[in-house]
Regions:
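Bacterial Sec-dependent N-terminal signal peptides
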Residues: 1-22
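Signature for phosphate-centric chemistry
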Residues: 21-139, 148-240
């Protein structure tokens, strides 16, 4: 019996420990990958096969943590809580929180956050720590980004960190619309797949709305509001 109790206790401890992490990971594209303060040597480097030495790295990365994609998304959410008379007590509390979030986000829609910069700086530190011979003095680094502001700034955070680590690198850094054809390429097959598999989410926002609004019929796009609120709250971890 003691053994069973111990196993149950251990299981509960593990579950509670994972709960906070899993909630963050549920943010999907807004999940903020952790950044460590070390030089990157905490994770083991991939070893080259016997008789070979690393001489080249090709890195294709997404932009770092960002704000929600457009200011209009913040404004739209805030507008849904404009009618105080239709808000429940919880709805009034949420309105106050949403207002503070939107004020803080004003003018930042789609932009890279400070955490996003740190994530790409950390990638550069790990690369340099694991493969210093590739980034020796006089070696060349060629970097390209899409025309998106957050992507260009992610690239600059990465290359600037490399420059700090090895000032004698030859950096070729550019953002050019001419490169978009291969940076953001979508094959005809992928486009067809997206069209074929696009389905409307079968999720009811009824319970969600009833917690916030007295008359839910006044909300024109209930599913959109629920998903946008999910995106709003998930994105908060990107601005810590």
């Amino acid at each position: 019996m003691k053994k069973v109790s111990y196993l149950i206790y251990l299981w509960l401890v593990c579950c509670l420990g994972l709960q906070a992490q899993s909630r963050r990971e549920m943010g999907g594209i807004y999940y903020a990958y952790p950044v460590t303060d070390d030089a990157g040597t905490d994770s083991p480097a991939v070893k080259a096969p016997a008789g070979f030495s690393p001489y080249y790295i090709s890195h294709y990365g997404r932009h770092g943590s960002r704000w929600m994609s457009r200011d209009e998304r913040y404004l739209w959410i805030e507008k849904q809580f404009a009618d105080d008379g239709n808000l429940t007590p919880l709805g009034l509390q949420i309105k106050s929180i949403v207002k503070r979030i939107c004020e803080n986000a004003k003018g930042n829609g789609g932009k890279l956050t400070r955490l996003g910069e740190q994530q790409h700086q950390a990638i550069a530190r790990r690369m340099y720590a694991h493969y210093p011979q590739i980034f020796a003095a006089g070696h060349q680094v060629k970097a390209r980004s899409s025309v998106s502001d957050r992507c260009a700034k992610s690239m600059l955070a990465f290359t600037s960190q490399l420059r700090n680590l090895q000032p004698q690198l030859h950096l070729d850094v550019k953002t050019d619309s001419a490169d978009m054809a291969w940076i953001a390429y979508e094959s005809p097959e992928l486009k067809a797949l997206k069209k074929r598999t696009k389905v409307k989410a079968q999720v009811s926002p009824r319970r969600f709305l009833q917690q916030l609004f007295k008359n839910t019929a006044k909300i024109d796009e209930p599913l959109k509001l629920m998903t946008e609120m999910y995106g709003l709250t998930s994105s908060l971890q990107d601005n810590q």
